[in-house]
């Protein structure tokens, strides 16, 4: 496995692979990899001949008061994860390699990005769409792998690829959880011991909501109220949003009559965590 920092080198290597008829899988990340990322890399390795993992903390998807400067970074640790999971190249560019000083072109999306995380982080998805488009252009993979924990992001990337006729297959992979149900996240490292215990309230609330739907409840407002009550029982938790939306359009639904995404964002102390489940009727 190699670590590559330049766009030119990644392109040259992928070009060689494709000249030999090899399929290329791609896993874009911001680093500080956990078992969720590892599962994406392993799946990419199983389904492709070669795998590229990008590690780039993308500055343009962070808001002015968000955690860009404190986002955890550990390339040595990440390299070991990538190599053991089957990656062939880590693409680890500097900011200057990805963005010219006078960079002024962005990829934006209407509708799908308005609610959920887009509502409280209004510039986030413009940054995500822009960097993912750039990475797709640089790596030119056959398939790209994203985790379902970031369900809105996955829907946005699928729509972007469709709308812009990008010839890459987008594959969503299941959420990987800790033994107590907390979704794996690089931001879990921010949590104190007390906050880490409190964070289990996210999965507990969603589990109860899923059971309620399975028992026949179809009123979205009742599901939202149930989740709200459970989360508010934890003194360290502060709700950002609780939504029941169409799993494709991300539009709110009043009644659960087709495939829906039940998604939440909750602050545990100062750390914002997200979780979700999809319910298919």
Predicted regions and their residues:
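Phosphate/ribose-recognition catalytic cores of enzymes acting on nucleotide-derived substrates
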Residues: 226-281
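Nucleotidyltransferase catalytic core that binds NTPs
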Residues: 2-236, 245-247
């Amino acid at each position: 496995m190699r670590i590559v920092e330049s766009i030119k080198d990644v392109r040259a290597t992928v070009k060689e692979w494709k000249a030999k008829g090899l399929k290329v899988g791609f896993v874009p990340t911001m680093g500080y990899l956990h078992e969720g990322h590892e599962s994406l890399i392993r799946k990419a390795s199983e389904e492709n001949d070669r795998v590229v993992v990008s590690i780039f903390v993308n500055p343009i998807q962070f808001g002015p008061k968000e955690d860009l400067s404190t986002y955890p970074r550990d390339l040595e640790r990440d390299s070991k994860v990538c190599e053991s999971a089957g990656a062939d190249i880590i693409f680890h560019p500097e900011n200057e390699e990805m963005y010219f000083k006078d960079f002024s072109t962005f990829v934006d999306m209407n509708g799908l990005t308005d609610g959920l995380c887009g509502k409280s982080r209004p510039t986030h998805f413009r940054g995500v769409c822009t960097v993912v488009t750039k990475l797709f252009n640089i790596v030119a993979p056959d398939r790209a792998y994203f985790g379902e924990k970031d369900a809105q992001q996955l829907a946005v990337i699928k729509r972007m690829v469709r709308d812009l006729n990008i010839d890459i297959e987008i594959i969503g992979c299941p959420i990987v959880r800790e033994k107590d149900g907390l979704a794996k996240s690089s931001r879990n490292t921010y949590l104190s011991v007390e906050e880490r215990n409190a964070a289990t309230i996210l999965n507990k609330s969603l589990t109860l909501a899923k059971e309620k739907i399975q028992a026949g409840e179809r009123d979205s407002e009742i599901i939202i109220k149930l989740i709200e009550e459970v989360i508010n029982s934890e003194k360290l938790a502060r709700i950002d949003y609780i939504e029941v939306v169409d799993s494709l359009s991300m539009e709110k639904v009043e009644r659960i009559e087709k495939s829906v995404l039940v998604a939440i964002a909750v602050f545990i102390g100062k750390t914002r965590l997200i979780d979700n489940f999809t319910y298919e009727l």
